[in-house]
Amino acid sequence: MRTLFLLRGAPGAGKSTFIRNNNLENYTLSPDMIRTMVQCPVMNTKGEYSISCHNDGYVWNTLMEILERKMQRGETVFIDATHYRAALLNSYNKLIKKYRYRAFIVDFTDIPLEQCLKNNRNRDRYKWVPEETIRKMYACFTYSKEVACKFKIISRDECIKMLDPISCLF
């Protein structure tokens, strides 16, 4: 299908839940998943376990290497990440052109901030994201709309309608 779906929204917006509820795990790359593969949750300064971001360079390089291998085979791929910064969205352009992919942003930025914060509080404790971080990321979506416009932005329902049941056997 040669399609790349970039999920975009604040932590707690429901991106991973969307993937799980639609049985898309086998088609999904997630920096959070790679982070926990590289390092188990660690105790922070507050005495709570959390996922470390100290390996993010390695995590994103690994994600991009796996993505390229999938794109070489023409696979449909979902990236489950916040994509709150323009640089993150732009990092896919080279591969999109090289492998002649269609790319879409699956928009979760319409989820209210309060809902994101509530969902975050209901996560396993080690997966919590500090509320201040969520608020900062949420504010970034307003300022990076112009970059997101380089990609076609689609709703979650539009995304599901686009999936070809023959090429995505789920």
Which role fits each region the language model picked out?
Residues 53-64, 86, 131-138:
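Amphipathic alpha-helical transducer elements in NTP-driven molecular machines
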Residues 37, 41-42, 71, 83-126, ...:
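ATP-dependent NMP and nucleoside kinases share a basic, alpha-helical "lid"
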Residues 2-8, 13-16, 21, 25-27, ...:
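Conserved GTP-binding G-domain of TRAFAC-class P-loop NTPases and closely related GTPase folds
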Residues 16-75, 115-117:
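Conserved substrate/cofactor phosphate-moiety recognition/catalytic segment
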Residues 23-24, 72, 98-100, 148:
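Short, well-ordered coil/turn elements that cap or connect secondary structure elements
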